[in-house]
Amino acid sequence: MASILKPGDSYSVHYKYKDHSGKPCEGWESFKTKKEAQERKITVEKELLDGTFLVPDTMTVEEMLYKWIPIQSTKHKWSPKTYTQSVAMVQNLIVPYIGNRKVQELRTYDIEKFYATLAKTPCGQYVHGVKQTLTDKQKKRLLSSTSIHEVHTLLKTAFSYAVEWDLIHKIPLPREAPKANSEERTIWDEKTMLAALQTIENPALHLAVHLSMILSLREGEILGLQPSDLDFDAADGRGTILANKTMQRANKDALEKLDPNQVYHTFPDRREGSKSSLILKKPKTKKSNRVLYMDQALEGRTADMAGKAEAGRAERPREV
C-alpha cells in the first residue's frame, strides 16, 4: 500500500489514495532518516486501511473561514449585525495573522502564539483587512481580553466544521479558552432614574427613557414600536405593549447575503451612496417576542404621544 524510496540523501514514502471525489491520487512525503520514513509508512498504511487517512489539502485558514461564514450565517439565520461583526473579526483579527497558514498544518502551539500576539495588538490595527497607521496614543490601547475570547469562540465553531469536512482530525485550539475579564455594568438606582425623568424636557426622549426604565426595552425595540403594537384597552385598561421587532442600522453588504425574511422593512437612504440602511427586523430570538404591561403613568404618556403622532400624520399633505 505504501513504499519507501531513496532519491538522493532523503527517504520518500510513496502511497496511493483517492480524494473526496473518488479520483485516484499519489502521495509523496520526504524524511531525513529511514526510521522516520518507516514510521510514516506504517501510519499511512493503517490510516488507509481503517478509513482515517486525511486527504492532503492546501486550503488556508482564510479560505476555510470565508467558506464557513456563508454556511454558518444561513444555517443559524444570522442578523446583519452578527454577520458584519463576524466578517470584521475575520478580516481584522484573524486573517492578517494566520490567514495564509494551511489548515492541516496549524497546531495548538501556533494558536497559542496567535493569541499572545493579539494580546499585544492595538485596537484598530487593521480596518477592512488593511493595516492602519496609528498614533502613539492609539498604539497604547490594546485589544481587550473579551475580543480575544470572541476570536477563540469563532475559531472553535469554524474548525469544528473543518473536522466535519474531513480537512482535519481534531480542532487545533487549546483546551482552555483565553480568559475574558467581564466588567460589571453600573445600573441606575431609583433616585437617579427619577432625576433623569425630571430633567428631560423633550417629550419623545422622556417617553423613550421611561419605556427603557420601566419595561427594560432596548433602544432598537423602542424605535421599532408601531401604533399597532399598543393596546390601551388590554389588561383592564392598564394597557400593553407588544415587543416583536427592532430597528437597527445594517451594512448593505450584509443585507444582500442574509435571509430577506428577517427584515420587515428597509427605510429609504437619506444620503446618496450610503453603505448602510436603517431596517426594521425580527428580534434576535423568539424569547424577545413578549407582551409588556404598562403602569398608569406610562400608559398616559404613551397614549398622549401616540395621539400626537396620529394627528401629525393626518395633517400631512397627501401625495397626488
Pin down the residues of each PLM region.
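N-terminal DNA-binding recognition helix of tyrosine site-specific recombinases/integrases
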Residues: 1, 89, 93, 101-109, ...
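N-terminal DNA-binding module of tyrosine recombinases/phage integrases
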Residues: 5-12, 16-112, 128, 310-320
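Conserved tyrosine-mediated DNA breakage-rejoining catalytic core shared by Y-recombinases
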Residues: 7, 192, 225-304
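Conserved hydrophobic/aromatic pocket- or pore-lining residues that grip, position, or stack substrates
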Residues: 65, 94, 111, 155-158, ...
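Phosphate-coordinating loops and pocket residues in cytosolic domains that bind phosphorylated ligands
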Residues: 66, 105-108, 120, 198, ...
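Flexible interdomain linker/hinge and immediately adjacent N-terminus
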Residues: 113-114, 164-197
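Short pre-functional
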Residues: 153-160, 206-223, 240-241
